[in-house]
């Protein structure tokens, strides 16, 4: 099990008496230990960027500590306000239903603790730049940039029941294509189009060098499934710990906090 990543707040900022509102970074969770280890590293970077704030990692499912456990700990520490930032790339069931339900129960258990849910990471341009960089690192040097127009990239995501959530992945692929000139297609690990279908579409579009770019924060069973389904193409690394990811999480924190202050004014 992975314990909480936390930093004790010490400095009043923006008119707040000590402590500054905590940040609870909520990851999905996975049966694959690589996923929890990666998210622990991600949140360690987030905490290091602003050591004046109490930062903790929680998981929606399958790993500990749970959201309930972390909220209990934050309340016991004496916090009266925490921002809950979903470490989720899409705004689907977990962000819209699962996490809000958990927070509603937590508010009932701790009426003295204000819990403000921040926005998801989403298709932020900074993350798409990181996706490009991960893909470039996997691309043979002789291919890019001289033959960039013949590169085909499958942007691979989890997949959701929500068409709007899946459309966000298509938007990521469009932005990546605009940024690089690469041919792009999308695939999903849990629904269609599959990775093999997406590769076939790229071949039809005359892509000569095909890679899979996982739109995932961490490796796990689903990224392994993608590799197993398409073992003959190069798979780039997941996003993982990254300066851009850290910046985006703190932007979501600040935006959520500003909104909460406006509502209470």
Language model regions located:
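Active-site-proximal alpha-helix that buttresses catalytic centers in soluble enzyme cores
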Residues: 1-265
């Amino acid at each position: 099990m992975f314990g909480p990543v936390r930093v004790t707040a010490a400095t009043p900022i923006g008119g707040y008496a000590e402590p500054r509102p905590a940040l609870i970074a909520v990851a999905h969770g996975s049966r694959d230990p690589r996923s929890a280890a990666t998210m622990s590293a991600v949140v360690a970077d987030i905490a290091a960027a602003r050591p004046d704030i109490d930062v903790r990692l929680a998981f929606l499912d399958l790993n500990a500590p749970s959201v309930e456990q972390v909220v209990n700990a934050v309340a016991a520490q004496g916090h009266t306000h925490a921002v809950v930032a979903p470490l989720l790339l899409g705004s689907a069931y977990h962000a819209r239903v699962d996490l809000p339900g958990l927070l509603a129960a937590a508010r009932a258990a701790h009426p003295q603790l204000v819990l403000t849910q921040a926005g998801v990471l989403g298709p932020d341009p900074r993350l798409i730049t990181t996706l490009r960089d991960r893909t470039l690192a996997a691309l043979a040097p002789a291919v890019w940039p001289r033959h960039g127009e013949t590169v085909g990239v499958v942007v691979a995501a989890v997949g959701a029941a929500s068409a709007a959530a899946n459309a966000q992945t298509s938007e990521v692929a469009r932005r990546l294509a605009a940024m690089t000139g690469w041919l792009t297609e999308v695939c999903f690990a849990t629904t269609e189009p599959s990775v093999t279908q997406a590769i076939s579409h790229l071949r039809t579009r005359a892509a000569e060098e095909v890679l899979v770019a996982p739109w995932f924060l961490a490796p796990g069973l689903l990224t392994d499934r993608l590799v197993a389904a398409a073992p003959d193409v190069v798979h780039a690394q997941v996003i993982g710990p990254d300066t851009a990811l850290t910046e985006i999480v703190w932007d979501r924190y600040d935006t959520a906090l500003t909104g909460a202050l406006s509502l209470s004014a």
